[in-house]
Amino acid sequence: MAYEPDVMRRALARLEHRRDRAERRRFELERALYAQEPRLRQVDADLRGTMAELAELAAGGKPVAADGPEIAAIRTRNQALQKERTKLLAGLGYGPDALDDIPACPKCGDRGWTEDGQMCTCLRKLCTQEQIRALTALLNLTDEQDFDHLRLDVYSDAPWQGQSRSPREQMRRVVQVCEGFARQFPSYPLKNLLLSGGTGLGKTFLSGCIAREVSRQGYSVVYDTAISLFAAFETRRFTRDAEESRQARDETRRFLSCDLLILDDLGSELTTPLAQTTLYEVVNGRLQSGRHTIISTNLSMEHIAQRYTPQLASRIGGLYRELTFYGDDLRLVHV
């Protein structure tokens, strides 16, 4: 699971802020308790001293038996100090671990990664929140723009020329597939979708619903336009600037490695040889790695076959489920 670099940076920054805030609270409490009970400060200093003595013995060069008199004496003093410390804290109304550095997440110690190098659930949760926030801002989504609030009555129930179903019945079928894809991600039988149809028919709205639902489940989602994708790959290939090259690598990597890529407005770009190669690299690479993709376009599958290479058209036509949108432009009908 690979989140966008900006999403990861914001999540890690929140984790660092959480650690800093906890440390400030611990320090302020420690200062207050030391002021109330000066003996507590001395006990803590003496406890640190016993640990320093043990370290000095270990580094002394001569063998020291674990049950020898030196170790036993230090251990006895340490235990006596701990008992006194517990009693002092209790007298102030606190438990024995009140001043300990206890992380909010015991799995990773509030670092975001477990000892075996895996992303911790606490960091994944923060990434999910940041990803939803970014998608909401990008798509200008409101709280009611999801599958639970989607309305089919805005689509005409009258027959549509050249189609066997009315726009409303067609959208009912389209929504059924999109909702199943999102709610059952990544195990839904259909792995890749092609949302095809004119402007103002709900492709972007449904894409946003899918992005939000898949994000809520903790998967990484990248939503971007075809033009942005091609620009990133072009920069990666031609730039000579080191910083631009690094940023371009991050950009192109996110298109290839995210759990779900939603590519909007395919067909709006200039169809150059580089664009053809780039699109095939992304589509084929994601198919080979088993990652899921949704392509939104004004082009029909027939027009895609005319505009792009046979190899690319074959991959999309054979391994994507085309969902056709038709009807009146809702932006004009409901002004």
Identify the role of each PLM range.
Residues 1-13, 18-48:
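Short, charge/polar-rich alpha-helical segments
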Residues 93-145:
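Interdomain "pre-motor" coupling segment immediately N-terminal to P-loop NTPase/helicase cores
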Residues 143, 147-193:
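Pre-Walker A (pre-P-loop) alpha-helix and adjacent loop at the N terminus of AAA/AAA+ ATPase modules
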Residues 159-174, 215-257:
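Short glycine-rich substrate-engagement loop in P-loop NTPases that contacts/grips substrate
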Residues 190-206:
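Walker A/P-loop nucleotide-binding motif
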Residues 191, 219-220, 257-260, 289-295:
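Loop/turn-to-beta-strand initiation segments
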Residues 205-218:
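P-loop NTPase Walker A phosphate-binding motif
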